[in-house]
Regions:
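Single conserved hydrophobic/aromatic residue that forms the stacking wall/gate
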Residues: 1-7, 11
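Hydrophobic core segments of alpha-helical transmembrane domains in multi-pass membrane transport
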Residues: 13-23, 48-61, 108-116, 132-136, ...
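Juxtamembrane interface elements at the cytosolic ends of transmembrane helices
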Residues: 14-40, 53-66, 90-93, 133-150, ...
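Alpha-helical transmembrane segments and their helix-start/interface "positive-inside/aromatic belt" motifs
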Residues: 36-52, 162-169
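Outer-pore turret/helix-boundary of cation channels
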Residues: 47-82, 87, 171-197, 214-215
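Transmembrane helical segments that form the transport core of multi-pass membrane transport proteins
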Residues: 69, 73-114, 122-127
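C-terminal structural cap/anchor segments
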Residues: 118, 124-194, 202-204, 229
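Transmembrane alpha-helical segments and their short flanking loops
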Residues: 175, 180-257
Length: 257
């Protein structure tokens, strides 16, 4: 039992540190207190903690009477916490992912889609992108013009980039899923989508579909992993040539939404 516990603790520690990124780790080492951390580090640490907590609670509630039915309470909580942490980074699993409920699969996909911090070992859209977009959405609903957090205002440029990243990521995942459902018509949509999101987040979790893949599926999954790791926005910027700056601006128009 002890080697298993030690191994699990090491996996959790390495997964969390790997998902934070070296900028946050170095900042933590130098700052020594939360108040002295940079805005980036505060965002990453706060969002990471909330995602781990939310993932743990919902995974426990959803799988308590399913994949973790025959476990004790402490073991259930430990497994829920482990899956919540590793789903966003390392991709290790202590339960059979192929037997989880559909709502649980959707939960894990959401965590994998968000991923870890920028400049970390994780893929996905990144936690900073997620939290900036979330803040902008809530402030828009509240009719608040200024987007700020931790007494710092968020630049409109970052908000724009966050929404662009999320939209092109959703479009990319949707396109790849559409292609794979054509190639692998015998596999349920939810399982194909899970594989694509897992690859995009460079997580590696699978619902035991490797043996059922057809033709070019493995190659497509590899491409998705590379895109998730490098970042679709970075790839798009590298492929699309920059536009020459204009020395003039048009009069603003009004559009009804």
């Amino acid at each position: 039992i002890m080697p298993s516990l030690v191994g699990s603790e090491m996996c959790i520690r390495d997964s969390i540190l790997g998902g934070l990124g070296h900028l946050v780790v170095v900042d933590l080492w130098n700052a020594k207190s939360f108040r002295k951390l940079s805005l980036h580090s505060k965002l990453v640490l706060t969002t990471t903690g909330l995602l781990i907590l939310i993932g743990t609670v919902f995974f426990f509630l959803l799988e308590n009477q399913n994949s973790m039915l025959h476990m004790g309470l402490i073991e259930k909580i430990g497994n829920a916490f482990f899956q919540s942490v590793t789903t966003r980074t390392a991709g290790f699993n202590t339960i059979d992912v192929g037997n989880i409920k559909t709502p649980t699969a959707l939960l894990l996909m959401a965590l994998m889609f968000i991923g870890g911090a920028p400049l970390s070992a994780a893929g996905g859209i990144k936690v900073t992108t997620f939290v900036i977009a979330t803040i902008a959405i809530f402030n828009t609903i509240r009719k608040e013009k200024n987007n700020s957090i931790f007494n710092r205002e968020i630049s409109e440029r970052y908000i724009q980039l966050s929404f662009v990243t999320i939209l092109i990521s959703i479009a990319f995942i949707g396109m790849v899923t559409f292609i794979l459902t054509i190639i692998n018509s015998n596999i349920p949509l939810i399982k194909v989508l899970f594989e694509v999101v897992s690859a995009f987040g460079t997580v590696g979790l699978t619902m035991d579909l490797t043996s059922e893949y057809y033709n070019w599926t493995e190659f497509i999954i590899i491409i998705v992993m590379l895109c998730g790791k490098i970042g679709l926005l970075n790839i798009s910027r590298a492929l699309v040539p920059p536009k020459d700056p204009k020395n003039y601006r048009y009069t603003k128009g009004h559009i009804h939404l």
